[in-house]
Amino acid sequence: MSDRTTLDLPAYGLGAAGLGNLYAAISDEQAYATLAAAEQAGMNLFDTAPHYGHGLSEQRIGAFLSKKDYRPAISTKVGRRLVPVGSRDMPDNGFESPAPFIPEFDYSAKGIRDSFVSSQKRLGVDVVNMLLLHDVGEKTHGDAHEAVLAQALDEALPEMAALKAEGKTKWIGLGVNEIEVCERVLDRIDLDVLLIAGRYTLLEHDNSLPFLDECNRRGVRVIIGGAFNSGLLVASGNEPLRYDYVDAPEWAVERVGQMREACAVYDVPLPAAALQFCGAHPAVTSVIPGARSAEQVHQIARWTEMEIDPGLWNLLREKCLISKTVPVPS
């Protein structure tokens, strides 16, 4: 069993994909203000990746930290290398005005180490608290999934373990949107942590609950990303309704509407219920909602601190909107 006692994480951290201009561009100044607000709110875990803005998110975090003594826990990822765009067309990965690089999958041992060294330079750090293998899974790789998984098991994860042994990171694990690949990897390799995005949420948890229960039994820590299901659980007004990074399906929109009505009975904002729900499972060590402005961070902090009447969880169960057996805040 890995030593998982060496890293204390806050209950809530910051998902930094938005700092890489996910969906819309923000200025450097807005990114720095977002990070400063997270520091003020005690959200002392920044989760980033080379993929986010093609290096831009890491660059902005590095620039922010270079001017301060503040040292949050940092999580970044490997599995893609950034290649100068040159004369090629920039791919549409959902990031507006990304840095001039193209992310290319590379799960080889050399690719993992080269990616990590590049992240060190962008972040301006020698050591990261967590190093996660990014986006291994069938939905990402399709027909190539089995070959990718084999290389991840044979090369990528052993190289990450070597980086951990060298003191370059404290924890290693996966950063994924799929439960099945987590199960398959854990059958072969003892990991410290799993960052699971969008699969354990107020809206969607029936399929993932047994796996989180197993993580708790095995002592594998879980970080929850995508607590708002790509923004669907927090969208208001005329904001786009997204689920799993694409337009939300009708069933999801309808179910979220029913949840919002139940929350209104207890005068609880749906996003507050969504965040606090994710953190209630004993396997979960941190929840990392994304934010792209100081105002959003301050709002998230208010939601996490809000007292929620236990009657809300009972009502959601009565309406069959959450599992009868899922842990809820007490």
Give the positions of each predicted feature.
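Active-site groove signature of glycoside hydrolases
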Residues: 120-142
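Short, acidic/polar
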Residues: 25-38, 108-122, 177-184
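Conserved, mostly hydrophobic/aromatic
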Residues: 14, 31, 46, 61, ...
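Short, flexible, mixed-charge acidic loops at enzyme active sites
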Residues: 84-95, 236-241
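N-terminal binding-site loop/beta-alpha segment at the start of enzyme catalytic domains
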Residues: 1-84
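Short, well-ordered coil/turn segments that N-cap beta-strands
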Residues: 6-12, 42-44, 69-72, 125-129, ...
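Beta/alpha (TIM)-barrel catalytic core signal, keyed to glycine-rich beta->alpha loops juxtaposed to Asp/Glu
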Residues: 30, 136-323, 327-330
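Active-site mouth loops of central-metabolism enzymes
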Residues: 17-29, 97-113, 145
